[in-house]
């Protein structure tokens, strides 16, 4: 079985005194479908570097690595081939940039970018494994300043 490895991030920030996290609506997906930014690990690239890069490419905001949150593992079928995929997620603190201001190179991949209230993110994200990563981020930040 073919294997694929990706990495993504839970980018957290405080906006108007409220903790928030960045979420994307991937291109071609319906309104209201929120996901975490992520992408394939480049050849020779470390997963945590991929996570920081993908978050910036897909949200327009740059984050600082805090820690690994965990992995999501699943099998899917593409063009008749079963693929085992591992996606590693990392907690990132907002550093700079404007959410939603994407370069033309990546704008086609992302239909929308929003800050979601951190405490509501586990309910608002579309995919179960990503909801778990949002919960892990909340637990990791418990009592820690964002």
Feature map (PLM): residue ranges:
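N-terminal strand-loop-strand
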Residues: 1-36
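Residue-level marker of positions within ordered structural domains that often coincide
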Residues: 14, 95, 139
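Unchanged
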Residues: 41-132
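A small-molecule sensor/coupling module
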Residues: 133-137
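Short, charged, intrinsically disordered terminal tails
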Residues: 142-146
């Amino acid at each position: 079985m073919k294997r694929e490895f990706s990495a993504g991030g839970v980018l957290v920030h405080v906006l108007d005194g409220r903790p928030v996290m960045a979420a994307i609506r991937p291109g071609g997906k319906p309104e209201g479908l929120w996901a975490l930014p992520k992408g394939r690990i480049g050849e020779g690239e470390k997963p945590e570097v991929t996570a920081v890069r993908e978050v910036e490419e897909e949200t327009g905001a740059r984050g600082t690595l805090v820690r690994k949150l965990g992995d999501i593992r699943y099998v899917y079928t593409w063009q008749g081939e079963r693929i085992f995929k591992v996606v590693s997620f990392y907690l990132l603190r907002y550093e700079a940039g404007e959410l939603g201001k994407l370069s033309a190179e990546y704008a086609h991949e992302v239909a929308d970018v929003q800050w979601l209230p951190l405490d509501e993110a586990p309910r608002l994200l579309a995919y179960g494994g990503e909801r778990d990563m949002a919960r892990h981020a909340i637990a990791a930040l418990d009592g820690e300043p964002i």
